Amino acid sequence: NVALPDRPGSLGLLASAIGAAGGDIRALAVVKSEDGRGYDDITVAVPGNDPTDLLNVLGAIGGVEVLSITPL
């Protein structure tokens, strides 16, 4: 589950960063938009099942906050 700025291009930037980190988006659901923030559930296949690199890449994007991760 992630929160990001609710403005054009934010989700595209997030998706590009996931791909650059080797992640493969398997599902995406826009949960809500509130107070200028978008909240999305994203299912990502991560190489080697270790999300550390992905979390570091996402943490470097301004305004993006990883709220929770759930291993599958």
Model-predicted segments: where are they?
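A conserved regulatory-domain signal marking ACT and ACT-like small-molecule sensing domains
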Residues: 1-72
